Amino acid sequence: MAEPNQHYEVIIAGGGIAGVTLALMFEKLDISYFLLEGRDTLESDRGAGIGLQPNGLRILDQLGLVEDIEEATIPLEKWFSYDSEGNLMNDSDAMGQYRDKIGYPVAFIERRKLLPIMVRHIQRTECVKTSARVASIEESEDHVTVTTTDGLSLTADIVVGADGVRSAVRTHIDSKLPEPLTADDYISVACSTVYGMSAPTEGIAPGERFAVYRENQTVIGFTGKDGIVFWFVFENLNRNVPLSQAPRYTEAEAEALCLSVAHTQVTPKLKFGEIYKNSVVAVKIGVEEGVAKGWHTDRAVIVGDAACKTTPAGGQGANQAIESCAVFVNKLMAARKASQSGDKLSSDVVKSVLASYAQERAQPATTALERSQMVGKALLCTPGPATTLVKDMLKLSNEDWLLRAFMALSAAPYLEDVELTARGHLYNKAVEEARAEMARRQRVAKEVKEAEEKESKQAASIKESEQRNEFVGLRNPVQAATGVVEVGS
């Protein structure tokens, strides 16, 4: 264990996906840190599956994790979409092309498998303390002091809250705002879900995904390596419940929700009830969502779910957490390089780093939240534009689907001070080609629109001329008939 009185550049509160990602980034770039985790281990068995997409995997590849992750996963390749009557709306294999076209697949992995993979890569194990929750945070002009529930006191230049939706660091930040807030002011629960895992089930193969568009209750699922099925049953609460009042559910309530969709068709040869019969995990929770109002103080900042909590329907929660870590580290590294070698960052520079990070991540976080809400509303067939838009996307060709997907990934950040792998460069090439193709399509669409407008104006002009001639003819019947102008007309 590191000496308790040692000063660090960064204290990380939280040892989940975001916290461990930060630790690995700091080790890669020689940034001193200390990580505090409230549970008794970093290798938690809580939660079910985690979706990893190209934007997150590109960063994990920079950290040397992707090969290990791919050994434990299988890419998603086939996607079935059904309506509430069991009619197949779409079956697409566009996702199966991600690996070859953009360098990384979309894959699902058990949380209890992903975290151990990541934790094995931590070298400075003496800088990690479990069973240590943040009890208090005190900021001064030149450092921040973090005290844990077991009495440990540490100082650092910055404390980063990677401590989830009920973040102690965010609570500290909220208390320092000009108008203090609580999480209830921006995080709520609008639906519940049973997250589950099932043993391999006949009728759904590894690499297949399903989604059902159904009012009030619906189900989505993914298959991972060895046929393990990860699934979510969603229920619309038809109201927004503040975080502090988020409902807690029993096993009986979880079972009741799952049985309500047991008859639902999820693949051509399978109904959800068969998957549920093989379940090994089935836990019902309220699904929190929201973006924090304040992301930082002078020496405290938040990343991951502490800053932006989205629903599982969007499939970007872990990936957005990884992105936020990369942006924070990029800002910190830029400040370090700009300062004189070996000099501690001044208070003003630290403030600038945190403010710049928060400013850059605020809009992507809001966009991620809006997209996850849109997908959730569409899955539950909530009337409105979201349902129409998502269902229209199901009609896209593979080419158009990939173009839109790659455009959505085109602005994703990565670690600027760590070399990209060959796959990372392929990612960049793919999004540049997507940008060029989108620009070409927009240019063509503009030219077509301009041509149509020109043609419309010409047609209107001709019609106006014809109407004018008809009017003249009615006023001068002799002239109209003979072409002779009457004297005095």
UniProtKB/Swiss-Prot annotation:
Its cofactor is FAD. It holds the Pfam family FAD_binding_3. It is found in: Membrane. Residues 427-470 form a coiled coil. Residues 448-474 are annotated as: Disordered. Residues 448-469 have a biased composition (Basic and acidic residues). GO terms for cellular component: membrane. It is an enzyme of class 1 (oxidoreductase). FAD-dependent monooxygenase; part of the gene cluster that mediates the biosynthesis of bikaverin, a red pigment also considered as a mycotoxin. The first stage is catalyzed by the polyketide synthase bik1, which catalyzes the formation of the intermediate SMA76a also knowm as pre-bikaverin. FAD-dependent monooxygenase bik2 might then be responsible for the oxidation of pre-bikaverin to oxo-pre-bikaverin which is in turn methylated by the O-methyltransferase bik3 to me-oxo-pre-bikaverin. This is FAD-dependent monooxygenase bik2. The gene is bik2.
